[in-house]
């Protein structure tokens, strides 16, 4: 008995010592993390505001060479401190998760500074740096108070844009210059029309006078910036936008802990493209026998709502999708609060089809979540209206709602807010996980029977496959453009040939690839999640359920799938096998 008591006491003592060691290591790491985060949002105040950290309200971005150099050095300093962190082996599992997440965030920022050279080679960085909308879209404070912060931003814009000119180094990539010109002019139009309209209800005349003066200066600054880019930078620009294979590998590793070679990812992507084209053709034969797959899709697009019914139909269908999740035990819904289906605000409509606008994870007051759907414009021709509504055909609209809301972005946001994960896990998210999850949900829900069987089921499969083809083409084009020197023209043709887009939207997709190589992550993240699901099901055996998997994935924040594998899978030997 005495020996058993001693053994039990020794175990308790050992556990106590280990726990204290874990706590000491966790505390030391948290001190480094807190120091890093404080400086991080001082340099990126609008990012802090968007997360719901309103202590950064009214602070303005600074792109002076001294500030940028200091931030680059600060990132290196914290990367070195974390690399040399002596107590890492003593970290608890959750702190180790945060450690890895923070290291990735720092390395991603360093990649932007030193590899892609965003502040030297990308004028879009400056053209889109002023997110005035962050103070409009949430009613977390009276509009007059938020307008004061908008005035501060507007007053800062001219000096910011003037300073940015010192940072840009010729030659700049031509696609990024042309897009920056469009963004700057679009921002000027937004400020002059939409922003002025959005704040017109403020009754404080002195404040409104301040706003009008500051806004006029900001409008002029963005117009002048666009003109300067067009006159001074565009003639000297070239087509060297590609990262190159070596930097692309670094990009994958820094952004999402992906170590698979680009060539292997492309091989997987091309095989997936062929498979998905087959699925698209198979569904098309059921939807429109005797017609080509493209003709079948066009036939599907004719089944669309009227302009007046677009929002009500989306709202009604969204509730039926939500109920399907409950009835089929797809995922836990942590809240009864619904996302509000609304028309996309006028000032957000440029380039927007549908979008999910959720509050930041730390927002305590303006907690509304909006599922925005862009309506037809009154001045459009009948042909333009019909084409737009055709894109909102009943089947594609439901697939988009699955992606944006249930169980895509909105449900993932609800899990993030409800989960016990740390501030770090809520601040820094994986592109591949967040977009991969939403895209995964499209196929998963149709696989689980949403839309039924027979002809209706085939129509939903056709719509889902159409969305998948676009995302797979993005993966292939991203690698081909940045590793194989594919041109914008050739990328445009790739989208036309492989996901059957018309020339204009195909070129828009190709242009996006020049500045957003990460748009490969929609498909890559989806494929990683499908692999993780298979491995998790094999591990759990009779204890597996789809709901259990989805809850486990979403309750770990928004981490790269590589880290999720460590959290969910017991067998360490398979952690690196993400695809």
Regions found by a protein language model. Name each.
Residues 1-5:
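Positively charged n-region of N-terminal signal peptides that target proteins for export
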Residues 6-16:
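Bacterial N-terminal signal peptides
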Residues 21-579:
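N-terminal maturation segment of proteins
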């Amino acid at each position: 008995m005495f020996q058993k008591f001693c053994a039990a006491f020794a175990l308790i003592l050992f556990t106590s010592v280990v726990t204290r060691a874990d706590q000491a290591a966790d505390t030391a790491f948290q001190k480094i993390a807190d120091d890093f985060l404080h400086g991080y949002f001082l340099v990126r105040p609008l990012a802090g505001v968007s997360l719901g950290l309103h202590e950064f309200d009214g602070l303005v971005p600074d792109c002076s060479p001294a500030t940028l150099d200091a931030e680059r050095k600060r990132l290196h300093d914290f990367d070195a401190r974390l690399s040399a962190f002596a107590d890492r082996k003593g970290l608890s599992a959750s702190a180790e998760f945060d450690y890895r997440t923070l290291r990735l965030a720092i390395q991603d920022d360093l990649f932007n500074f030193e590899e892609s050279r965003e502040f030297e080679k990308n004028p879009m960085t400056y053209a889109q740096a002023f997110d005035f909308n962050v103070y409009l879209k949430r009613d977390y404070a009276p509009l007059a108070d938020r307008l004061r912060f908008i005035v501060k931003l507007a007053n800062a814009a001219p000096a910011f844009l003037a300073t940015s000119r010192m940072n840009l180094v010729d030659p700049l990539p031509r696609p990024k210059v042309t897009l920056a010109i469009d963004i700057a002019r679009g921002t000027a139009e937004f400020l002059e029309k939409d922003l002025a309209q959005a704040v017109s209800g403020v009754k404080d005349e002195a404040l409104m006078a301040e706003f009008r003066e500051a806004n006029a200066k900001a409008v002029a600054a963005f117009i002048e910036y666009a003109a300067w880019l067009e006159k001074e930078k565009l003639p000297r620009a070239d087509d060297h936008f590609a990262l190159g294979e070596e930097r692309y590998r670094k990009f994958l590793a820094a952004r999402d802990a992906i170590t698979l070679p680009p060539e292997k990812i492309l091989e997987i992507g091309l095989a997936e493209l062929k498979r998905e084209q087959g699925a698209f053709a198979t569904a098309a034969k059921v939807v429109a026998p005797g017609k080509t797959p493209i003709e079948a899709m066009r036939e599907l697009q004719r089944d669309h709502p009227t302009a007046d019914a677009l929002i009500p139909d989306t709202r009604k269908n969204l509730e039926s999708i939500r109920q399907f999740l409950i009835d089929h035990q797809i995922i836990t819904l942590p809240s009864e609060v619904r996302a509000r289906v609304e028309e996309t605000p006028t000032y957000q409509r440029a380039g927007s089809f549908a979008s999910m606008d959720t509050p930041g994870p730390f927002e305590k007051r303006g907690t509304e979540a909006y599922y925005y759907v862009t309506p037809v414009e009154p001045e459009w021709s009948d042909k333009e209206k019909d084409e737009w509504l055709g894109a909102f055909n009943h089947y594609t609209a439901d697939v988009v709602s699955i992606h944006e809301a249930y169980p895509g972005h909105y449900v993932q946001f609800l899990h993030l807010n409800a989960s016990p994960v740390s501030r770090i896990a809520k601040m820094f998210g994986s592109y591949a996980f967040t977009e991969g999850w939403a895209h995964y949900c499209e196929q998963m829900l149709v696989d689980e029977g949403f839309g039924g069987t027979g002809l209706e089921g085939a129509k939903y499969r056709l719509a889902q496959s159409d969305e998948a083809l676009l995302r797979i083409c993005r993966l292939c084009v991203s690698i081909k453009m940045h590793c194989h020197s594919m041109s914008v023209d050739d990328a445009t043709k790739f989208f036309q040939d492989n996901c059957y887009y018309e020339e204009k939207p195909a070129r828009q997709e190709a242009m996006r690839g020049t500045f957003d190589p990460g748009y490969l992550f929609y498909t890559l993240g989806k494929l990683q999640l499908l692999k993780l699901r298979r491995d998790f099901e094999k591990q759990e055996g009779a204890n597996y359920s789809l709901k259990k998997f989805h809850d486990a994935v979403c309750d770990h924040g928004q981490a790269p799938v590589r880290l999720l594998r460590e959290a969910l899978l017991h067998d360490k030997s398979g952690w690196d096998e993400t695809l």
